[in-house]
Amino acid sequence: MFWRLRARLSYAVARRLMGWPWMVRQPRSWAWMQGQFSRMAALGDVGAQSFYGHLLLFRGQGFGAREEGLRLLRLAAAAGDHKAAYQVGVQALKGDTRHAADAREAARYWGQAAEAGHPLAARKLGELYRSGGPGLEPDDAQAERYETRARQLGL
């Protein structure tokens, strides 16, 4: 019980320290902060999984950082985090050297994010359905539906 409280408090302090650029530039403090993000994500906190997944995806160092970031983002998306779902959709459509671009998977994640209220996901999904993509045929009805949803959400 005590270790969970300690993990939450340490995570809150680490998130607060992210606002201080000079602290992020210090190797020891950065390593400590990453440890707190990792521990909280490993405990199953959806917000921490999303945050640390984004951090590893865009700023991670090492061979496995990108894959670990995507794994954490997928876990957060499965738990309902719309920002993580949007980013997993972007990465699915982009593809990489080991995985081909998959528009169907991108549409699934963007659909989840759009239904949760992510306006950019709705717009991108409308564009994807309008033009089609790798493994996804164009569908004007779905495109219109998601373009309308994007307008409702403010885009």
Give the location of each predicted region:
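Structural signature of tandem alpha-helical TPR/SEL1-like repeats
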Residues: 25-36, 61-72, 98-109, 136-147
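Canonical positions in the second alpha-helix
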Residues: 38-40, 74-76, 111-113, 149-150
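Short helix-capping/linker turns of helical repeat alpha-solenoids
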Residues: 10, 43-46, 58-60, 79-82, ...
